[in-house]
């Protein structure tokens, strides 16, 4: 009977006897059904829980109806919260993370900023926190030493107290992720490091082809079929055009010291040679290329001499298609010679050493591949054509015998250089000290 009277004296579903909760329950009586019989124990439990809470918690609880709050209290009443594992900040566990985080002691500015921030935030609640921090920093820099002294003393006191509280404290700064990101960027940059060098070689190949376009055959391509590359920069073009005007002179201090790989047959070179090619000096090869007087044929000419330039249409001879057109009395339109291991001597005329005939190499087309026109008569005029068409003058700084290119040889050297007995040709970058003398056959006029 006493329990029933207590239940009647309290509003139904009320967790506490406060006026606010009573008024709330009275308002919500219409939509919240009264608790069934036997809920007096729930009401008492709600009173105990509600009395233990502070006012803010009660205000937050008013969002829910009284019956919901009673049910939650009933469920949570017998639960032992010490069994719940506390979450560790920062993810991965471990002995270090299990310890509670100890903050560093505040320095003088932090003491000032903390006290001033509280005061200013109370006075100017609309101030943004970042703007407040900027202003506090400016004010701190304007303070004199005497004005800073109380904050410095407080910071020192806090430091001493911190040392007493945590005698074995060591500051362990958190590792920033940005450092790892920068490290990975540098790794990727190291992986990409070798590629710009290869691109530079590629650009040089395209650029030297552009240099030869300034001759007779504007708009026609010289060189192997390569994929399109980035065009040369203006600086490189400006450096290439004055070289076209220098006909026979060698520029001693040329802007570019590395070898231009445009006309070197890269398939002939091994990977080790290509790897160390940048260290070579252009003028190192000059000892093998004497300028004056008759000279023995060079290994590069044995390669380059097999090419043939017919009229105004440049032809790149492919290695994969060997030619059998070696008859000395061939007539009709000229056919290009294909580069083989031993160039056929049949297409070259009976020339004295040192005075080659450039008839087949000049800009004009001739009826036969090499029609002998006397020792000096035809060669001088054709050499003038060569100079005018800038085949020889395009890159005078480089040794002509080293580059396999149509009509890219010095006029003082024989154009034909077959070797005896089909000897294996040494590579162009490592000439040996002794050569077999070339054999010249007589080509009779048909």
Swiss-Prot record:
Database matches in Pfam families: HMG_box (PF00505), Sox_N (PF12444)
Basic and acidic residues bias (residue ranges): 155-171, 210-219, 242-253
Subcellular location: Nucleus
GO function terms (MF aspect): DNA binding; DNA-binding transcription factor activity, RNA polymerase II-specific; DNA-binding transcription factor binding; RNA polymerase II cis-regulatory region sequence-specific DNA binding; sequence-specific double-stranded DNA binding
Region ranges (Transactivation domain (TAM)): 224-298
Comp. bias intervals (Low complexity): 362-378
Entry keyword set: DNA-binding, Nucleus, Transcription, Transcription regulation
Listed GO biological process terms: adipose tissue development; astrocyte fate commitment; cell fate commitment; cell maturation; enteric nervous system development; fat cell differentiation; in utero embryonic development; male gonad development
Region Transactivation domain (TAC), residue ranges: 335-446
Motif 9aaTAD: positions: 400-408
DNA-binding positions: 102-170
Origin superkingdom: Eukaryota
Region spans: Dimerization (DIM): 58-100
Record's keyword annotation contains S-adenosyl-L-methionine: no
InterPro entries tied to this protein: HMG_box_dom, HMG_box_dom_sf, Sox_N, SOX_TF
One CC-aspect GO term: transcription regulator complex
Biased composition (Gly residues): 40-53
Chain residue ranges for the region called Disordered: 1-58, 155-259, 318-378, 425-446
Biased composition (Polar residues): 430-446
Primary localisation category: nucleus
Entry keyword annotation includes Ribonucleoprotein: no
Record remark on domains: The transactivation domains TAM and TAC (for transactivation domain in the middle and at the C-terminus, respectively) are required to contact transcriptional coactivators and basal transcriptional machinery components and thereby induce gene transactivation. The 9aaTAD motif is a transactivation domain present in a large number of yeast and animal transcription factors.
Function recorded in the entry: Transcription factor that may play a role in central nervous system, limb and facial development. May be involved in male sex determination. Binds the consensus motif 5'-[AT][AT]CAA[AT]G-3'.
Protein's name according to its UniProt entry: Transcription factor SOX-8
């Amino acid at each position: 009977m006493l329990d029933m009277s207590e239940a009647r004296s309290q509003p139904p579903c009320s967790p506490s006897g406060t006026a606010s909760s009573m008024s709330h329950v009275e308002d919500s009586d219409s939509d919240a059904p009264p608790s069934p019989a036997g809920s007096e124990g729930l009401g008492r439990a709600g009173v105990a829980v509600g009395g233990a809470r502070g006012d803010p918690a009660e205000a937050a609880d008013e969002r829910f109806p009284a019956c919901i709050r009673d049910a939650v209290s009933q469920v949570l009443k017998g639960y032992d919260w010490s069994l719940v594992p506390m979450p560790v900040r920062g993810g991965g566990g471990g002995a270090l993370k299990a310890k509670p985080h100890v903050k560093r002691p505040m320095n003088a500015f932090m003491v000032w900023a903390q006290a001033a921030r509280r005061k200013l935030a109370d006075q100017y609640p609309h101030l943004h926190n970042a703007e407040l921090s900027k202003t506090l920093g400016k004010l701190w820099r304007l303070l004199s030493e005497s004005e800073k002294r109380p904050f410095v003393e407080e910071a020192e006191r806090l430091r001493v107290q911190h040392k007493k509280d945590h005698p074995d404290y060591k500051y362990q700064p958190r590792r920033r992720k940005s450092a790892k990101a920068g490290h990975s960027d540098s790794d990727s940059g190291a992986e990409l490091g070798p590629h710009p060098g290869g691109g530079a070689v590629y650009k040089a190949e395209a650029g030297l082809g552009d240099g030869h376009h300034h001759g007779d055959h504007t708009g026609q391509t010289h060189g192997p079929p390569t994929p399109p590359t980035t065009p040369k920069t203006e600086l490189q073009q400006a450096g290439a055009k004055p070289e076209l005007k220098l006909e026979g002179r060698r520029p001693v201090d040329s802007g570019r010291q590395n070898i231009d790989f445009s006309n070197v047959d890269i398939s002939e070179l091994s990977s080790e040679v290509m790897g160390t090619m940048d260290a070579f000096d252009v003028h190192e090869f000059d000892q093998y290329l004497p300028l004056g007087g008759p000279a023995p044929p060079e290994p590069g000419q044995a390669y380059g001499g097999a090419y043939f330039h017919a009229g105004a249409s440049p032809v790149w001879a492919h290695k994969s298609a060997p030619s059998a057109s070696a008859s000395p009395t061939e007539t009709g339109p000229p056919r290009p010679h294909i580069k083989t291991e031993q160039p056929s001597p049949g297409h070259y005329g009976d020339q004295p050493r040192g005075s080659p005939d450039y008839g087949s190499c000049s800009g004009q087309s001739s009826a036969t591949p090499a029609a002998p026109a006397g020792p000096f008569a035809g060669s001088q005029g054709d050499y003038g054509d060569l100079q005018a068409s800038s085949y020889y003058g395009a890159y005078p700084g480089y040794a002509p015998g080293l580059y396999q290119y149509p009509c890219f040889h010095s006029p003082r050297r024989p154009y034909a250089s077959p070797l005896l007995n089909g000897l294996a040709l040494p590579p162009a970058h490592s000439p040996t000290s002794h050569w077999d003398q070339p054999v010249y056959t007589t080509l009779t006029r048909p």
